[in-house]
Amino acid sequence: MSYYEDILKAKNGQVLFLLGNEAIARGAIESGLSMAASYPGTPSSEVGDLFYAIHEKAKMHFEYSVNEKVALEVAFASSTLGLRSMVFMKHVGMNVASDAMMSIAYTGTRGGLVIMTADDPSLHSSQNEQDNRHYADLSHLPLIEPTTPQEAKDFITLAFDISEKYSIPVIFRTTTMISHERGLVQVSPRMDQKRMSNFESGKDMFNSLPQFASRNKKVLQEKIANIKALESDRFISVERADEDEWGAISSGVGYAYLHDVIAKYKLSISVLKIGMSNPLPEKSILKFVREHPRIIIVEELDPYLEEKIRALCELENVDSIIYGKMNSYFPNDYEFNMDIVRSGVFKAMGKEDPNSFTKGVESPLVAPRTPVLCSGCPHRASFFAVRRALKLAGMEDAKISSDIGCYSLGAYEPFDIGDYMISMGSSIGIASGIPGSASKRTVTFIGDSTFFHSGIPGLINAKMNNAQTTLIILDNRVTAMTGQQPNPGSRDLDDLDSKQNISIENVVRGTGIDSVVTVDPFNLGKMLHAVTESFKTDGPAVIISRRECAILRDAKEKKAGRHVVYTVNTEKCSGCDKCVEDFACPAISIVGGKASIDPDQCDGCGVCSQRYVCPFQAIEVA
């Protein structure tokens, strides 16, 4: 059996060592999950990886949808038929899905519907670190936050139970450290999946016309009030200290750091851990703060709990002193660690930080390392050709907008590709709106998966308004950055020529754009020609730069027993450094004044052997 099959088939009581995301997937399967949908995004991707691998054996439907909004709509539709359904995404994906989510909150559901958001404090792989707990307030939906992989598995089942009992979607929030930490998880029996029920007709069921939505708003508020009255012990735990002066309230991964600080330094602090952050368990909180005159609140990102607890104490005339983010005991940005939590706790308690003597003298032990594209990455060839074309056309100052994906790394030297990079699909709209773009041409980069996700409306807008931009769609045949997931253009990764795959060329031509060419970026001459010609176009021109992701290609080459490596003919090499300075492949370096290729890193793409990279053609097959 495969690793994922082991997770699926684990028996009741068996203990597994799982990622938080894997525990969530196992918990969903235990809950009788029938349908799941997602658009991949770190740090949520491993949930989809597991479902993609085992969905047939689990007798459930799983799909990678074109974007998060569609994924939620698909899962919602299944839930209206009584099936337990789930959608999951990274935190910024909630922005995309929120349009549908706000209305679905009003209509409610029938089968359980869980909406998982994986937040990314410290922006490990994201363009912001928004705190999606606020979506619970905005949508009036329950919010559940686990602390450990075991809780992640157990709480997902509770989320389905609450959703189904109250006919309401439930938001399930993790963070990077919860999703990607490993821990021991004891599994439970798998529930039988519910059978599809007949759809109950009636426009007032799942219709958001104002006359129905106005009634549903009151129903939604009643649901939240009923859940609030529940205050389930499953989501609340209290750890009592010997003394009553100090108490702490925490949730999510913040609790884990707090627990370790208290244990390591033997602090006398009672702790209230909250697993459901909306609706807030006000009775339990009031009881706790009244028992402790001094309260420390530990939570990552925004003072979400703190603001509510302060307001509650003010309303109920509780005079406990609160120490948190709002009075600068803890930072408002980035993820926490044990040092940050220890520092805040000791500051609140008026104790000397035991590690304060090291502050100001710490220095990085490793030299800064700029992220780079993989050896053999087709994006490197595309960037190289575009930079050369811009130079030849005297357009080196042209504005370049980029998008979300591996190719975002083009912003680093030597390519400097990406004056703008904002959000999924934004590159085309931005390029169309750059001042002067009506007369001076811009260049736009977007990946294949991102193009399908949200780039098409921008392209239609560019055509409608005759934007003077060259759009380069970097089609590496896979959603690469999040872990090699398929997308509409590569539904079958084993057969990239399958008729099931949606043609980017046909989509682009369907907008009315005539200037559409497809080029292999490894052929630098043809790529350079295509880009140069596109600059002569009136209106938008599209170049589809198509070549498999190096990781995807390498897996196939390894399976076939093929591997080509290039080397440098030192007699031909002039030591000009152009292959390193301009092409920036991590396999190439300068050793003893000559170029040198590391055979362990060389991918065998051969692009560096072309005269555009090495004018002396000193790079040859080993």
Q: What positions do the PLM features span?
A:
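Conserved thiamine diphosphate
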Residues: 120-175, 203, 207, 211, ...
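Short acidic, glycine/serine/threonine-rich loops at helix termini
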Residues: 47-50, 74-76, 97-101, 123-130, ...
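Thiamine diphosphate
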Residues: 1-149, 177, 241-242, 315-544, 550-556
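Short helix-loop-beta junction
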Residues: 50-57, 259-271, 506-512
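Flexible, low-complexity linker and terminal segments
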Residues: 1-21, 146-373, 378-379, 521, ...
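A glycine-rich helix N-cap at a beta->alpha junction
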Residues: 58-64, 107-118, 196, 200-201, ...
